[in-house]
Amino acid sequence: MLALISRLLDWFRSLFWKEEMELTLVGLQYSGKTTFVNVIASGQFSEDMIPTVGFNMRKVTKGNVTIKIWDIGGQPRYRSMWERYCRGVNAIVYMIDAADREKIEASRNELHNLLDKPQLQGIPVLVLGNKRDLPNALDEKQLIEKMNLSAIQDREICCYSISCKEKDNIDITLQWLIQYSKSRRS
């Protein structure tokens, strides 16, 4: 019953107030970026994802918020495009495979190199450690330390440990993005 009332309130609010936000999703290949987009768009997880070639754009509506998501390929040849797609967005979402400890250093370096770009100064960053359902996956505290997130001082930064497969913490991730979008516009 409460869910029905909540949906009705969201629908009623959407008649008078719509919010749009744009974000860019980046991270090394095989971290789960496209899977994340599919899970928030449709609630569906698929094991059969293929790597993104270049970029994909998808619009997802949650309540009265429409999120335009740029999903950028993570292979080395596409990383030079990251900055271009991150300019002017409401938030940058940086995805990490939290279970692949061998790639953490490369992931940290790519994140810090990206955020050092003057054109991206001040854009908030949401760091997501995906695949928390796998053995030996780093938790939030370990991600913050290994990714040296405390060194990032010029912007809002948040970190969550998620699992697209199990849909763990997907809701809190969306809440952060939507809340941040609302607070940035007020």
From Swiss-Prot:
Keywords: Cell cycle, Cell division, Cell projection, Chromosome partition, Cytoplasm, Cytoskeleton, Endosome, GTP-binding, Hydrolase, Isopeptide bond, Lysosome, Membrane, Mitosis, Nucleotide-binding, Protein transport, Synapse, Transport, Ubl conjugation. InterPro entries: Arl8a/8b, P-loop_NTPase, Small_GTP-bd, Small_GTPase_ARF/SAR. The keyword Transport applies. It catalyses: GTP + H2O = GDP + phosphate + H(+). Small GTPase which cycles between active GTP-bound and inactive GDP-bound states. In its active state, binds to a variety of effector proteins playing a key role in the regulation of lysosomal positioning which is important for nutrient sensing, natural killer cell-mediated cytotoxicity and antigen presentation. Along with its effectors, orchestrates lysosomal transport and fusion. Localizes specifically to lysosomal membranes and mediates anterograde lysosomal motility by recruiting PLEKHM2, which in turn recruits the motor protein kinesin-1 on lysosomes. Interacts with tubulin. Interacts with BORCS5; recruits ARL8B to lysosomes. Interacts with VPS41; the interaction mediates the recruitment of the HOPS complex to lysosomes. Interacts (GTP-bound form) with PLEKHM2 (via RUN domain); the interaction is required to recruit the motor protein kinesin-1 on lysosomes. Interacts (GTP-bound form) with PLEKHM1 (via RUN domain); the interaction is required for PLEKHM1 localization to lysosomes and for ARL8B function in delivery and degradation of endocytic and autophagic cargo in lysosomes. PLEKHM1 and PLEKHM2 compete for interaction with ARL8B. This is ADP-ribosylation factor-like protein 8B. It comes from Macaca fascicularis. The lineage of its organism: Eukaryota, Metazoa, Chordata, Craniata, Vertebrata.
